[in-house]
Amino acid sequence: MTDKETQNENAPKKLSLQRRVKTTVAGGKVQVEVRKSRKIDTEAAKKAAEEAKLKAQEAAEKAAAEKAEKEAAEKAKKNAEKARVAAAVKKPEPVKVVDAEKDRIKAEEAELRRKADELARQKAEEQARKAAEEAKRLAELAADRETTEVSDDFSDYHLTSTYAREAEDEEERRKEGRGRGKNKVGKAKKGGRDDNGSKDERNADRRNQKDVKGKGKQGKKGSSAIQQAFTKPAQAVNRDVVIGETITVAELANKMAVKATEIIKTMMKMGEMVTINQVIDQETAQLVAEEMGHKVILRKENELEESVLEDRDVNAEKVTRAPVVTIMGHVDHGKTSLLDYIRKAKVAAGEAGGITQHIGAYHVETNGKMITFLDTPGHAAFTSMRARGAKATDIVVLVVAADDGVMPQTIEAIQHARAASVPLVVAVNKIDKPEANPDRVEQELLQYDVVSEKFGGDTQFVYVSAKKGTGVDELLDAILLQSEVLELTAVKEGMATGVVIESYLDKGRGPVATILVQSGTLNRGDILLCGFEYGRVRAMRDELGKDVESAGPSIPVEVLGLSGVPAAGDEATVVRDEKKAREVALYRQGKFREVKLARQQKAKLENMFSNMAEGDVAELNVIVKADVQGSVEAIVQSLQELSTEEVKVKVVGSGVGGITETDATLAAASNAIIVGFNVRADASARRIIETENIDLRYYSIIYELLNEIKAAMSGMLQPEFKQEIIGLAEVRDVFRSPKFGAIAGCMVTEGVIKRNNPIRVLRDNVVIFEGELESLRRFKDDVNEVRNGMECGIGVKNYNDVKVGDQIEVFEVVEIKRSI
């Protein structure tokens, strides 16, 4: 393989840089501009030139060596000639002939060596010349491969004239042609590294110009394989960043399309230390995003909720609606009996223990007009239910028993009505009783700013008897009169809104909610959003259990079809889109869960040290199940209020509906008692309760439930111990005994001195020793007790400093049971 072939094989196959080809259309005429695009095999030419230079250097070195050798040979020849001449002078003639022959032979050998060296030098020069010609040929071959291409990239178009471009091309050709000559070896010798260096610089400049100009498709075609480095964008891309109420650092980085470390660095500069998963608020996120040059769009998390709730029917006509009346008052003052008489139905007799357990909603017609009544419980435990009743109502009828007067729940009902800005109508009940005193009721209510019309106020007082029906018509007239003054109106046609009065879980029908419609008309098939729950209305029933297709303003109905049991007091709203209703319900559940977890975390942190300080506090774990949501709330609240510093009631679970297997398992795991209020346990739950020996209790009256829980808590209290003095003896004399030490001769002045009880020694009414007796004798006999007025000898254990005049006090420790 020849040197030429080796060079061709080692040369890069396709390393080329292209120059520009342009086509422009300007000024209404077609002007085709074609610039030659020159591809130069840069690396191959450069490598060939370097090899040629190296060979030329080698040839020069060889030539220098040959020259030195030649000079040495000539010098040796001259010396030999001198020696020969000298020898010819000294020696005789025959010897001269021999020496001349030897010198001739040596000269011929030197000449042969010189010729061989000359041939080698010529051969080296020929090889160097061929290498230079090969490099020139490669460069010319690259120049011959010039092509023309048409560019469609309008951004690369420049407005230089044709003459200017031709002049530019001519200048480039002239510069490139400077280094090209016939004698490449000589040029390599003379130019050295400087010429190549300047050529490399020119090539690099040309590549840079092409890289700057080469963009888009043309740039991709014209770029060399060597120039593949990634060029970072000179300017960051600014984006519109949508930020919710809270956002993590990682999410913010993702939205801004930057690394999370950049955000952390920025926040460190702003004086805030954060981690990648840390949640930051909307304001902080806005500052960070704006600091990094992005535009911020703030978004409310509940935007969907607001849009769903605002999507209502507008411009609907308002009509007069029936008043919603809530009956309030103290327990057993006759609220339900009064309502029962109004409804002409015997509902009140079914209430356990005379206490209204649920909030009931009924509507009645009188004198052609309709009134909706809400009945609230009067017991102290049902504060939250009364507050809900006042919120949903237009008029409050305050029932006060004429024989009882104003009681605590009466005052509370007045406060609820005031808080809700609802007018009062006072019904003084039980006026048929002999001990009734209606005037006293009016006087007592004056101190709570409830002034009757008789005293110049604006509150109507009506005297009624729920048993006999006395004054009931007057009460209804007073309610209708008050409603006319209020001018109650509501939109009848359109999407309904209302409030959940009560809710419970029915085993056969699922979640059931009693909803009081406040505006619009609720139809069967409507999509309803209630707090955390949603669903399509599958069925509606009135208070008598009859199916109804629709319910207008001020009408209470039972609704079936919700996804779960809503909380009493939740707002019920009809929406258009079931999918959006589901999203809103899930969003509300998530928010509630976050708030609950945050509250629990806060409570854990706050209680950590206090719990450590308190030590072990006795806990009574309770699981509460009731038939309706209102009862669950009332019982849980009442139980939590029973907690003391020593015994805490912990409600580990509560819910609406029967006692299930899950409840029983939870009770077994947490060692809790199960309380069922108007509900029962199913068969599977009963099996677990019997197996695990769980305490299960059923109640229908809240008084009994609270009293029994109190008793259970009392049993968990630490008992108190009290010291009772049972006897006192006065020391009259002191005897010394070798066996017992000091023996005190005493006279019992009070009570009984007992042998086995603890004693105290008093001197000048100050306790100086507390211990026990070692011996108690009457004369020489050991006795167990000595009564008042008798003498005895007393030996005090581990104490010999008894003196005359001291008193010995005997006491016993009595355990006292505590109660809550």
UniProtKB/Swiss-Prot annotation:
Residues 320-489 form the tr-type G domain. GO terms for molecular function: GTP binding; GTPase activity; guanosine tetraphosphate binding; translation initiation factor activity. Residues 354-358 are annotated as: G2. Residues 1-21, 113-234 are annotated as: Disordered. Residues 465-467 are annotated as: G5. Residues 375-378 are annotated as: G3. One of its GO terms (cellular component) is cytosol. Residues 180-190 have a biased composition (Basic residues). The keyword GTP-binding applies. Keywords: Cytoplasm, GTP-binding, Initiation factor, Nucleotide-binding, Protein biosynthesis. Gene3D superfamilies: P-loop containing nucleotide triphosphate hydrolases (3.40.50.300), Translation factors (2.40.30.10), Translation initiation factor IF- 2, domain 3 (3.40.50.10050). Residues 329-336 are annotated as: G1. It comes from the Bacteria. This is Translation initiation factor IF-2. It comes from Mannheimia succiniciproducens (strain KCTC 0769BP / MBEL55E). The lineage of its organism: Bacteria, Pseudomonadati, Pseudomonadota, Gammaproteobacteria, Pasteurellales.
